[in-house]
Amino acid sequence: LPACICSGPSFVILTVGEQLLGSRSAGVCLFAAQVLAGWLTAALLCRVRGIPEPLPAPPAGAQTEPPPALDSILAQSAVTYLKLCGFVLYFRLLAAGCGLLLPEALAPFPAMLLEVCSGCDYAARTGLWASGLCCAALSVQGASVLLQVRTLCPPEVSLRPLLWGRLLHLPLSLALFYLGLPQDAVESFNTLYARVVP
């Protein structure tokens, strides 16, 4: 699970990199850092915790129920999709509220903890540390993503490895991001001015 939670390449490369930071190459470096940090995090967690025992197979007699009907599957899918969208909207509104109440320099931090898109949006406006803060926002993922994962996973799947994974992922992704950038790119990304939106 810790290696699977990552924002998609189109969001990271095109939206965060190209649109928010003004550089597609920054987006590629961000995405590469996120994927590599996810793999390293999963490898470290497997090394520390060991490979988990597989869940026991259900008894043969328990499979006598007929499979659910197609209409109930579609209805359940629609409800789940609405829950996922609801988490994004709810935490985006909370992040926007924090952005209005807090000074501009502090606005990215609660946004990062609440919702990844808001975190990247506020982080990109900081100028000096925009690329590093966007990397941190992508690594943390926010409460919205954690609740989306909780909604999609069955109750017997623990989120504890994912939470530990996020703690490991953050320093790894930042280190990989800055190690993977050429020095002149680091200097130019760290001196970006806040974007002006007409």
Language model segments and positions:
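Generic transmembrane alpha-helix signature in multi-pass membrane proteins
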Residues: 1-2, 10-20, 118-126, 146-153
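Alpha-helical transmembrane segments of polytopic integral membrane proteins
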Residues: 9, 13, 87, 91-94, ...
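C-terminal transmembrane helix pair
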Residues: 10-11, 35, 39, 130-198
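Transmembrane helix-loop junctions in multipass membrane proteins, especially transporters and channels
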Residues: 20-23, 42, 46-55, 100-104, ...
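Alpha-helical transmembrane segments
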Residues: 26-42
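Hydrophobic alpha-helical transmembrane segments
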Residues: 27-32, 85-86, 133, 163-164
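Intrinsically disordered, low-complexity non-transmembrane regions of multi-pass membrane transporters
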Residues: 49-75, 188-197
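Transmembrane helical segments that form the transport core of multi-pass membrane transport proteins
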Residues: 70, 74-138
